[in-house]
Amino acid sequence: YYKIFFCSSEMYYNSFNRVSQAYSGPIEHAVDDILRKKEYLNSTKFLTYEPTKTNTKLVIPNTKPLNAISFLASQSISQRYKNAGYLFYETANGFNFRSVESLLAVNGVAPRPTKFDYKYQIQTVAQNNENKSPSLSGIKPKDVFQDLKGVLRYEFDRPVNMLKNINEGLFANKMITHDSFYKKVTTHDFDYLSSFGDYFHTETQGADKADFKGLVPLHDYEDTQKDFGEQANAKLMVYCDNQKIHNNFEFPPLKDTIQNRRSQRLQMMNINLNLEVYGYTLLHAGDVISFDLPLMRPIINEGDKQQSSPYFSGRYLIMAIKHEIDVNGNKHTMSLKCMKDAVKTEYTPGVIPFKPDTKSYNKAFTSVYSDDLNYLTDNFENA
């Protein structure tokens, strides 16, 4: 048999075309121009965009169209939300150019409703006898909609890596900018914990964004009297922030793009969930779903209900969908790659202060030559 791989016509145009052009004004207009022009991507597909407040002039030098759009996305600042950096992706409905926060909220005032609700549950008799006719097997016909909500398999493929999160600047980072025009050096610190409530997250409830449901609890690290968000030296970045390059056009402020975007992208790489579910073609990348994950512990008392995981249940954002169609088995399933950037229930804040036992610390240091001399002395005395 043959294995055939497909791609869009835009991918072919991207392979042999390049963009060498300067764009000024709103960035979404530049994206639409690259998408439509025949000498670039020559696309006729629908484009859904989120308006930007970025009014700048950007020069794209001999760059492939999709790479040019990725660059423009990195420079975009939302008109309604505080986050920085846009996503450019395609679904069955066309292309999308928008921020992550616009996927999680509606008009900047409320969390976006879930498109579908999944639950990990025991398969029904109808599911286990799906190849049998209901009239012959003596079972009731399937409740199709209820079966669609069931999860065939799930796994978390990216467990939280605290050291990577710290070193890459998720929780805190420091950026030093140098402006050659004004001859000015400025330092900016980013604090994930203190700025958490400024943005919509997967677990934001209502219009109130103040509830802290971050990836780490609010607690000082050991005896430093600082939490993870105050350790800005964990990630140091240096950038040129020159002004007056294109007359009255100004670049997006780096303090509003680089640091925030770095943290947000790292948040998307932490709680990553893979779901195998029944096929449902109304779901697309960028939709919000809910997943009820049972708490993995035994039910002791009769009549008690299975509790949901307080941290990993809840709302997820779909990052990618893979449809799998088995023609011979008459079966359609989907693999959903999802993420969440907040826990359902806030981690318990640390209330017991750390008190190091200084008496047990061994602060002395010893020369290896002294150890060798003691070893030789002991051996000669015992000889």
Go through the PLM ranges and name each one.
Residues 30-44, 48-51, 129-175, 346-383:
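Intrinsically disordered, low-complexity terminal/linker regions enriched in Pro/Ser/Gly
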Residues 68, 76-77, 94, 102, ...:
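Extended serine/threonine-enriched, polar tracts that run as long, contiguous segments within proteins
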Residues 209-240, 285, 290-383:
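Acidic, low-complexity/disordered segments
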Residues 119-285:
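Charged, gly/pro-rich, cysteine-poor intrinsically disordered low-complexity regions
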Residues 1-10, 265-277, 314-320, 332-342:
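Oligomerization/assembly interface segments of phage tail-like spikes and tubes
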Residues 1-46, 57-58, 73, 101, ...:
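Surface-exposed cap/loop segments at beta↔alpha junctions
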Residues 7-11, 93, 100-103, 278-280, ...:
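Solvent-exposed coil/turn segments that connect beta secondary-structure elements
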Residues 4, 47-158, 162-171, 181, ...:
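Short beta-strand-centered interaction patches in the first periplasmic/extracellular domains
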